[in-house]
């Protein structure tokens, strides 16, 4: 049925004779539909013109919001954070792949080399203060969101996905180092790397000996003043200048010999008496209750000091203890192997105020609360004093490497959201690296084509058994170069700085440290920390400290990440396809699709791929593996042998939104944008396609409101209730050609020539489109040859609205191939000349697969290679089935 039959009959300004003419033969109706007067009259009847009156716009309809109605994000206190496996690709990935799949092609090697490791070096990077590390997107749950985000970052660090910044030039992480990280190793599993020791041996020997000698002399005799020591050193330096280089070497030798006598004879070391030399650099832990907090009353010293109680000195001992949570909740329980903090020996006053990554002394908030008197019933002292040992202030990973200069800043903020619109029980980390996508310093990301609807139909619309795989945490599989760490920094400002910026205490200019500290002691903070203590246990102390981390694996907030992930998965799909030429393998981002003729064969391929991927370090999410049978659900579509259709959930969503649209009310153009985005997903399956939404496009481009009339709304509902599948293209030879001039049209087939004239001159692109529609109506050919690039593109939104809708209805499922004007056999008939029939140019349609990185023509496997399936394949190997 004609898509405008019901609509034209409901328009009162159109007479019955005019309606019959518009719905009549296409050679008479199509030129009329291109007329400007008819389009204006229909637009007036449907009230499609933009409103000129100053009316109040509607800013919300159903779940669609527009201007001035931002939807507040919902925080879930019971969010479950995901657990990440040990994501570590094989160090020799390319060599390992060649063992499994044979020699790689040039394209496959190029794609893998882009990702191993990935490189990211923008032109300019903006650094933000650490206070912007965790975004306050949930004001009512600020503390809960702060600790949950910090815990998520520490979870990523434990999985080897993030680096932890120790200082400006060193990073630490957990897991196995890659080959490019071996060149920057400083420490591995607690041992200094050999190359690092050799580079520092000569420079550190003298400095270390001088430092130990000075500490030994000061501990051996308290009466020795620093002035005498400096005089002795100056005297020795004066002697060395007089005696020359030999005297200088003799002094260094004497120092080393004296140091050896100290270590072998007196056995007196820093902060400890009677210890063996093996325990010189060993961590000395003590009970958390043995520490007392004191303040330096001097005005010149702006730091605080720690004293170790002499009465409880016998209780302190050296030990290592796992960081276990005292929590009863099962929401967060990541294993952490942390050591206790180091404290000074009894009777020796020593400054152990924790230094931050810049070397600036910063006190520990937890210890300061522990050693002060409570200020009230809601003082945090009550929470801190409930445990003897809260663990260290920071941790160190298994591996420490050198890095470029990394400032104590961040380059992007982080926050948590729902994992997806259908799963609000789990959380997902969002990293805001939008600075690299805007401004004059924005990075121009590499472009890669996403498979369009016709490509999916050509590749996957077959009668096969289907299976879909999902790569677990796909982005975090791809390692990134350590040199890119200064550009991808995230972090936490710490509890004190975070809460100070939220509360009104920022206006308090009092320099009292106690008063600033006790500003945290409110009922809300106290109750929140009590609940968080049940969740995190003593890990709450670690989460309250500031830290800076850099990405070791590919983050999701950078525009480079989708491109690299597409290259990585497409290379894997290409290798699997070469070794199994009788199956279909397709990859889009982290989704892989396998297709085979029988379910038994598909099971064998699946088991082989799982074992190979696991050996390579690629983790597949087994819970998301789905067996679809003959109906593949992929990218929101249902793909069968008869074509592609949208899933039912999208159709129901569109129907619900269209029914809820108010009539005769000006809708905000932002609502039109979001509604158009939803309708566009299903528009290719309707009779009129995207052309039916052209009035909405015009309102959005003009940034004006749009009024839905009852006729236009009912017409859209009728279009979206009747959906047609997108079928796969066939490789056929073109036998029908069309051409047009502003005054006439012509059609050429293998057996006849047709021509005609228009009642009035038309634009050349409009005339060419009408000629193609006439050729499709009269010959029924699904492949037409034309010399007009506008018609070849298939984008009809630039034509008059009525003509574009009807042309999409006529040309649905029709393919085009280009023929030069000089070789177009319909060129002369379009000019009114009917020459003798001549042979048509032989043009064959190649089904569209687009220039996408997700599909590549792979050469078949050599027949001499052993088969990868243990049992005989049901498909004959002499005639392998090639995917379409």
UniProtKB/Swiss-Prot annotation:
Similarity remark: Belongs to the hepadnaviridae P protein family.
UniProt-recorded name of the protein: Protein P
Misc note: Hepadnaviral virions contain probably just one P protein molecule per particle.
InterPro entries for this protein: DNA/RNA_pol_sf, DNApol_viral_C, DNApol_viral_N, HBV_DPOL, Hepadnavirus_pol/RT, Rev_trsase/Diguanyl_cyclase, RT_dom
Known regulation of activity: Activated by host HSP70 and HSP40 in vitro to be able to bind the epsilon loop of the pgRNA. Because deletion of the RNase H region renders the protein partly chaperone-independent, the chaperones may be needed indirectly to relieve occlusion of the RNA-binding site by this domain. Inhibited by several reverse-transcriptase inhibitors: Lamivudine, Adefovir and Entecavir.
Domain comment quoted from the record: Terminal protein domain (TP) is hepadnavirus-specific. Spacer domain is highly variable and separates the TP and RT domains. Polymerase/reverse-transcriptase domain (RT) and ribonuclease H domain (RH) are similar to retrovirus reverse transcriptase/RNase H.
Residue segments, region Terminal protein domain (TP): 1-184
List of residues binding Mg(2+): 470, 590-591
Gene name of the encoded protein: P
Region of interest (Polymerase/reverse transcriptase domain (RT)), residue spans: 388-729
One GO process term, biological-process aspect: symbiont-mediated suppression of host innate immune response
Region: Disordered, residue numbers: 299-345
MF GO annotations: DNA binding; DNA-directed DNA polymerase activity; metal ion binding; RNA-directed DNA polymerase activity; RNA-DNA hybrid ribonuclease activity
Residues annotated as transmembrane: none
Chain's role: Multifunctional enzyme that converts the viral RNA genome into dsDNA in viral cytoplasmic capsids. This enzyme displays a DNA polymerase activity that can copy either DNA or RNA templates, and a ribonuclease H (RNase H) activity that cleaves the RNA strand of RNA-DNA heteroduplexes in a partially processive 3'- to 5'-endonucleasic mode. Neo-synthesized pregenomic RNA (pgRNA) are encapsidated together with the P protein, and reverse-transcribed inside the nucleocapsid.
Catalysis: reaction(s): DNA(n) + a 2'-deoxyribonucleoside 5'-triphosphate = DNA(n+1) + diphosphate; Endonucleolytic cleavage to 5'-phosphomonoester
SUPFAM superfamilies: DNA/RNA polymerases
EC number: 2.7.7.7, 2.7.7.49, 3.1.26.4
This protein's UniProt keywords: DNA replication, DNA-binding, DNA-directed DNA polymerase, Endonuclease, Host-virus interaction, Hydrolase, Inhibition of host innate immune response by virus, Inhibition of host RLR pathway by virus, Magnesium, Metal-binding, Multifunctional enzyme, Nuclease, Nucleotidyltransferase, RNA-directed DNA polymerase, Transferase, Viral immunoevasion
UniProt domain Reverse transcriptase: residue ranges: 398-639
Region of interest called Spacer, as start-end residue ranges on this chain: 185-387
